């Protein structure tokens, strides 16, 4: 038996595991949650599944992480003072609500309740777009020049080192919102370019 199951693999693996957990009817009174960066697809999947008695799935997304994967890169205080987005539409049992409270409290996270469509839209702007900008910049800069650069460039390139296997799924699952964010950034970049060309102050 398990009190809490946390799915923290890439999105497709999380979805496959969730289906397997739903078939385990002996898994009772368990709180299952994921930590993926896109919420709508897995939330829609969970709505079609029937779990064991008292077992519930809760879409969540902690706003903390590293660009490097693997247990060797783990950190005990990773979640301290960071927001932890939680699907506000799920009505948890009293038992599972207590589990969620103590888990986030012990990790030092800040629970933030939000609906899934708004979450995915926000992530496209404050997480997914910065990732893509970092990746684009990493592909543009001559790698031989990076050791000569200061901390500004290195900070901007940090996200470019994130595993592509994770980000390729995020881009696919949140494609509509990401494209919208990219187009807005493109328009703003065009405005800045024209201002520089015409000598206007930024």
Feature roles, as predicted:
Residues 8-10, 36, 88:
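Glycine-rich, N-terminal phosphate-binding loop of Rossmann-like dinucleotide-binding domains
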Residues 76-161:
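Internal alpha-helical scaffold of NAD(P)-dependent oxidoreductase catalytic cores
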Residues 5-6, 33:
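N-terminal Rossmann-like NAD(P) cofactor-binding module of classical short-chain dehydrogenase/reductase
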Residues 2:
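An anion/phosphate-binding loop that grips the pyrophosphate of nucleotide cofactors and donors
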Residues 144-202:
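Interdomain hinge/lid region at the active-site interface
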Residues 72-78, 168-169:
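Short, flexible, solvent-exposed loop/turn segments with mixed acidic/basic and small polar residues
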Residues 13, 17-72:
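Rossmann-like NAD(P)(H) cofactor-binding subdomain of soluble oxidoreductases
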């Amino acid at each position: 038996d398990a009190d809490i199951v946390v799915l923290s693999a890439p999105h497709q693996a999380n979805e496959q595991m969730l289906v397997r957990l739903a078939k385990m009817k002996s898994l009772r009174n368990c709180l299952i949650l994921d930590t993926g960066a896109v919420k709508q697809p897995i939330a829609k999947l969970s709505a079609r599944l029937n779990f064991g008695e008292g077992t519930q799935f809760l879409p969540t997304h902690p706003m903390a992480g590293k660009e490097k994967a693997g247990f060797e890169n783990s950190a005990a205080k990773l979640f301290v003072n960071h927001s932890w987005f939680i699907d506000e539409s799920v009505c948890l049992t009293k038992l599972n609500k207590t589990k969620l409270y103590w888990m986030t409290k012990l990790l030092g996270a800040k629970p933030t309740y939000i609906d899934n469509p708004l979450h995915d839209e926000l992530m496209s702007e404050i997480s997914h777009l910065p990732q893509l900008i970092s990746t684009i910049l990493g592909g543009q800069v001559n790698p031989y020049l990076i050791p000569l650069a200061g901390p500004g460039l290195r900070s901007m390139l940090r996200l470019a080192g994130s595993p592509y296997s994770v980000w390729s799924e995020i881009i696919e699952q949140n494609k509509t919102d990401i494209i919208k964010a990219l187009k807005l950034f493109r328009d703003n970049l065009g405005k800045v370019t024209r201002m520089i060309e015409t000598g206007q102050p930024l």
